[in-house]
Amino acid sequence: MTDHVSLNYKDAGVDIHAGYLLVERIKKAVKQTHRPEVIGGLGGFGALCALPQKYREPILVSGTDGVGTKLRLAIDLKRHETIGIDLVAMCVNDLIVQGAEPLFFLDYFATGQLDVETAACVIAGIAEGCQQAGCALVGGETAEMPGMYQAKDYDLAGFCLGVVEKSKLINGHQNVKSGDTLLALASSGLHSNGYSLVRQVLNLSKKDPETWMLNGKSLADHLLEPTRIYVKSILTLIETQNVDIHAIAHLTGGGFFENIPRVLPKNTCVLIEESSWQWPCIFDWLQKTGNINKQEMYRTFNCGVGMIIALPENQADKTLDFLTSVGEKAWRIGRVDSSKTSSERIIFKKSILNN
């Protein structure tokens, strides 16, 4: 009979002790995100959270997302500090468009070989994103899967649950009307979409993103600028300003052409005034370097616009003043119009706002 060496889990590539070390590293950052509704801490089989008592007819709103191939850039450039903010932003910004207050967030971190420093850095970013959004990081899953990923590679996914009063649910399909004004909220940059095309352009440019400067800032800084989280600004707008928000669109994958129609009723379209804003320099660089036509830019990227709010024209000035007062860059970008066809929902024009 042949003697066999006694194997253990670590021999197979899974270091349980590293997982324990990671939990200890992140406990403080996680606890700082907790809301009064959170019951208990890390370590249970399931996270517990009560509904805020202020809601009479609470509607739960959930969302899940990732950060796409922006993660590939972060890994290649060894910049792990802010990708977690992106992960939270992609989820909570989808909730706020329906008027929902994010309650809690969970993350999924999968890797070929767990590097405690890298994972702790990423999760610290997730905790920072949760603090920006006012939601609690209540748990997650760290999966070490040798053979599934290259050793230092990792993947991320996030899940968020929020709540909105039934009477305050924002439903564009029911509320948007021809004549509504569209307000834009500036993005912080590319956010977390279009990065497969971004990486192609970067390869074509042959630029070193760490050393090549664009308007006084490294290309790497532009490309990895964290996604802006709009939750607190929009929630405060809803709760304090008595404005009748008809719809909010989050400009993510698919840009203008895919996201704005998601909140439009039938027989409506939107007119966008291109001259109402100037693209941030990173979008100009991408278009020029990649020889990308303007329609493709609008279909792939946010081009400097993170959110679009539809509301009655007589409430536009008040809303703009408030958004500016809470630190948002906002402006009139267009209006809703009637349409007899469903084929052309987004129309770009040089000038429409004074017509």
UniProtKB/Swiss-Prot annotation:
Record-linked SUPFAM superfamilies: PurM C-terminal domain-like, PurM N-terminal domain-like
Catalytic activity field: 2-formamido-N(1)-(5-O-phospho-beta-D-ribosyl)acetamidine + ATP = 5-amino-1-(5-phospho-beta-D-ribosyl)imidazole + ADP + phosphate + H(+)
Main location: cytoplasm
Gene Ontology cellular component annotations, sorted alphabetically: cytosol
Any single biological process term in GO: 'de novo' IMP biosynthetic process
Pathway: Purine metabolism; IMP biosynthesis via de novo pathway; 5-amino-1-(5-phospho-D-ribosyl)imidazole from N(2)-formyl-N(1)-(5-phospho-D-ribosyl)glycinamide: step 2/2
Gene Ontology molecular functions: ATP binding; phosphoribosylamine-glycine ligase activity; phosphoribosylformylglycinamidine cyclo-ligase activity
Entry superkingdom: Bacteria
Protein's UniProt keywords contain Ribonucleoprotein: no
Keywords: ATP-binding, Cytoplasm, Ligase, Nucleotide-binding, Purine biosynthesis
Subcellular location: Cytoplasm
InterPro entries: PurM-like_C_dom, PurM-like_C_sf, PurM-like_N, PurM-like_N_sf, PurM_cligase
Protein name per UniProt: Phosphoribosylformylglycinamidine cyclo-ligase
CDD domains: PurM
